[in-house]
Amino acid sequence: GQQAGLMHALFQAECAWLRYWDEGDAAQKAEALAGYRQVRALMPLHPEGALEDVGGYSADLLRSIDAMIAEAARGDGTTVRQHLLANC
């Protein structure tokens, strides 16, 4: 697709930052969350109705990522760990 390289790089960065968050103390978790927020800011929205080749993330997936970030910011790693197991 048009954004295949970007999507792959974002996926790798996402797994790295979430793993770093999961393995860290409070200071490392804060650093990891800041890094992951930068990755999230780069995630393009897939235009509704566009062909798959256009690339990007669905609005639903981006909302779930935002919810995972908020959960992690509260110190709850449940969804982070589920994401790591399922995707990384």
Where are these regions (language model features)?
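Extracytosolic low-complexity repeat regions of secreted or lipid-anchored proteins
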Residues: Q12-C88
